[in-house]
UniProtKB/Swiss-Prot annotation:
Record's protein name: 7-cyano-7-deazaguanine synthase
Gene: queC
Organism: Rhizobium meliloti (strain 1021)
Pathway the protein acts in: Purine metabolism; 7-cyano-7-deazaguanine biosynthesis
Molecular function as annotated in GO: ATP binding; ligase activity, forming carbon-nitrogen bonds; zinc ion binding
Annotated InterPro entries: QueC (IPR018317), Rossmann-like_a/b/a_fold (IPR014729)
Cofactor info, note text: Binds 1 zinc ion per subunit.
Binding sites annotated in the UniProt record for Zn(2+): C185, C193, C196, C199
E.C. no: 6.3.4.20
Known function: Catalyzes the ATP-dependent conversion of 7-carboxy-7-deazaguanine (CDG) to 7-cyano-7-deazaguanine (preQ(0)).
Enzyme class: ligase
Record's catalysed reaction(s): 7-carboxy-7-deazaguanine + NH4(+) + ATP = 7-cyano-7-deazaguanine + ADP + phosphate + H2O + H(+)
Length: 236
């Protein structure tokens, strides 16, 4: 199956790219610059494409991103510290982000005669992000079936939608994902902060998967307190 992977440069999407490269025909990586403060993640997506020997395209949607105000990822709003399952993490929601990116990706896939678009949404995202949930994935596929009816048949491949980030780490390890060559931190500093929701979730995932974490964090122990009142099943 000829597949285009939406790759941010994060742990999930880079692991997905390695999975697709091993199990299917990886035809390229597609990334989006939406004005995110952690834009450095795109450098890791580019490195992934070079490593896997496939084309990489960055689509500039910063003008759209500027209209999606109020998010800590695109606006002058502080990125909150803590676990993903906390109410404060709703500050990191970029409205309709996945729907926008997937719609563009499906158009690109149809034009390139690809069979599928792969996205790395996962169970840990369900609590905060509505466009990462199984219902959204199913509805988006149904919408695209109508949108491309008679022109192209493109499948939405979301193998992680019902699994945890720890499961992704385990899968990535099986496919030799170089985890040190991925970027998660929403704050976009020189190193992973270790305190924002995605850093906490990243650190927790390695622990639960029993896989060594090669990441350098400014605060490597914060995750213990942040995850103390949660278990992985609660945020799936």
């Amino acid at each position: 199956m000829k597949t285009i992977v939406i790759c941010s440069g994060g742990l999930d999407s880079v692991s997905l790219a390695h999975k697709v490269a091993a199990e299917q025909e990886l035809s390229g990586l597609l990334s989006f610059d939406y004005g995110q403060r952690h834009r450095k993640e795109l450098d890791f997506a580019a490195a992934c494409a070079r490593r896997l020997g496939v084309p990489h395209q960055i689509i500039d949607i910063r003008e759209i991103g500027r209209r999606l105000t109020g998010s800590a990822l695109t606006d002058e709003v502080d990125v909150p510290d803590g676990h993903y399952a906390e109410e404060t993490m709703k500050a990191t929601v970029v409205p309709n982000r996945n729907a926008i990116m997937l719609a563009i990706a499906f158009g690109v896939a149809a034009a390139r005669k690809a069979d599928a678009v792969a996205t790395a949404v996962h169970g840990g995202d369900h609590f905060i992000y509505p466009d990462c949930r199984p219902g959204f994935i199913d509805a988006f596929q149904a919408m695209q079936d109508h949108a491309l009816d008679g022109y192209a048949d493109v499948a939405l491949y979301a193998p992680f939608v019902n699994v945890s980030k720890a499961d992704i780490v385990a899968d990535g390890a099986r496919h030799d994902t170089p985890f040190a060559e991925t970027w998660s931190c929403y704050k976009g500093g020189a190193r992973h902060c270790g305190r924002c929701g995605t850093c906490v979730e990243r650190r927790e995932a390695f622990h639960l998967a029993g896989v060594p974490d090669p990441t350098e964090y400014d605060d490597p122990d914060f995750w213990v307190a942040a995850t103390g009142s949660f278990v992985a099943e609660e945020v799936k």
